[in-house]
């Protein structure tokens, strides 16, 4: 049985004071939720503060990116080892905004994923196609390239530290959402692909999240699909009430 995971990506929003207020407001709204893993991803500067505020409440903290070296002369970078030290249990790697604006490639995603696993973090490995790619019927080709690239040379034993997040780029921040059936089709493809690479039991155990304009209004339909195991939430995670509404998808 795969435990659902709901992750909130706060992106480049929330000062230290705002982040503290948000986690303080969120915790009481979700503290009684059982059998759902809850993760929030604040900006780097708020990670330690949010981790301390979350404490033993069950809400976990992720970073939005990391570097692939543990330490060294890499000005401006943050290693998975330091993220773990700051209170992170998870890290988002390969988000479409990193790929689009910062030159992230499948190769760097793979290096970062290996480094994060080495540090003991759980990776939220993001994949997804653009609108142009979907319209030219390249969705599955793009997804396969990204999944194979991200998982290259990662042994099956380490898959327990990887969660795949499918985020159709055309649905991020646009208000457009893939239909439940569209999302399920890609999730099923990803699971089949993981089965081809590693085997059916590994594929069956892997959690695959959907990301792309997830809201309290559409989470129930998405979560009713057999291969959708949770959500990577953007805008709706910036308000405690809406994020809690997503976390509480079971009612």
UniProtKB/Swiss-Prot annotation:
Species this chain originates from: Trichlorobacter lovleyi (strain ATCC BAA-1151 / DSM 17278 / SZ)
PANTHER family for the chain: TRIOSEPHOSPHATE ISOMERASE
Keyword tRNA processing carried by entry: no
GO molecular function, one term: triose-phosphate isomerase activity
One GO cellular component term: cytosol
Pfam families for this protein: TIM
Catalytic activity reported: D-glyceraldehyde 3-phosphate = dihydroxyacetone phosphate
EC id: 5.3.1.1
Annotated signal sequence range: none
Assembly information from the UniProt record: Homodimer.
Keywords tagged on the record: Cytoplasm, Gluconeogenesis, Glycolysis, Isomerase
Active-site positions on this chain: 95, 167
Record's subcellular location: Cytoplasm
Function according to Swiss-Prot or TrEMBL: Involved in the gluconeogenesis. Catalyzes stereospecifically the conversion of dihydroxyacetone phosphate (DHAP) to D-glyceraldehyde-3-phosphate (G3P).
Entry similarity comment: Belongs to the triosephosphate isomerase family.
Binding site for substrate: 9-11, 173, 213, 234-235
Name the record gives this protein: Triosephosphate isomerase
Listed pathway(s): Carbohydrate biosynthesis; gluconeogenesis; Carbohydrate degradation; glycolysis; D-glyceraldehyde 3-phosphate from glycerone phosphate: step 1/1
Biological-process GO terms, alphabetical: gluconeogenesis; glyceraldehyde-3-phosphate biosynthetic process; glycerol catabolic process; glycolytic process
Main localization (coarse): cytoplasm
